[in-house]
A protein has these predicted regions:
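Short, well-ordered, mixed-charge alpha-helical segments that flank or form enzyme active sites
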Residues: 14-15, 22-27, 53, 61-63
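Single conserved hydrophobic/aromatic residue that forms the stacking wall/gate
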Residues: 1-13
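Short hydrophobic alpha-helix segments
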Residues: 15-18, 153
């Protein structure tokens, strides 16, 4: 079980979210030591707003972002540890990082919400010895509700950054692009199936 807890200004745990999607990829063997979360998709109430915290692998699932948005999240936050496996070519590395940014910026656009993604940097050896380890690509970023980049960190060093986010823009963007309003919820039953026959 992987849990992210948000600590309020009074230094007490405000709420929890448990990672729902667990990977089993080269150098990411989490299915062997984590259990999928059981708390669902519930934003965490803070003095900063309602934060939709989704952990790492959850970032690839538009359903998770949508459920957080529908539950009232005002910002989607993705604490992440993702990088390149040692055998990835430079072209593959570029594709992976671009896909990683694109999918999360897509969550911002589809839900009319800012996205904050925080990723680690550095290298970690694979304790199993199956691979040469992972080089984490950093590149933490903040995107606005239209997917526009408000900030991007470097790929190879730790940084601290303060980024202003205008939460009022989400309402404006949702009026221009009313994706939540125009959903065809009557036609989405098959989304809960593993495969469609």
């Amino acid at each position: 079980e992987m849990q992210r807890s948000l600590v309020g200004s009074e230094m007490c745990i405000r709420d929890s979210y448990r990672k729902m999607h667990i990977p089993d990829d080269p150098a990411y063997y989490e299915k062997f030591y984590f259990t999928p979360g059981d708390l669902g998709f519930k934003p965490i109430e803070t003095s900063l707003g309602r934060l939709g915290v989704l952990v790492c692998w959850d970032q690839w699932y538009p359903e998770a972002a949508r459920l957080m948005a529908l539950a009232g999240a005002e910002i989607l936050i993705y604490p992440t540890a993702i990088g390149w496996e040692s055998s990835d070519t430079p072209d593959e590395q570029a594709r992976q990082r671009e896909a990683w940014m694109t999918v999360q910026r897509g969550h911002a656009v589809a839900n009319g919400l800012p996205v904050v993604t925080v990723n680690r940097v550095g290298h970690e050896e694979d304790p199993s010895g199956q691979t040469g380890g992972i080089s984490f690509w950093g590149s933490s970023f903040v995107a606005g509700p239209q997917g526009e980049l408000l900030y991007q960190a470097p790929c190879d060093s730790e940084v601290e950054a303060i980024v202003d986010i205008d939460l009022g823009r989400s309402e404006q963007v949702r009026r221009w692009w009313p994706f939540l309003r125009d959903r065809r919820i009557d036609a989405y039953d098959d989304l809960t199936k593993r495969f469609i026959d």
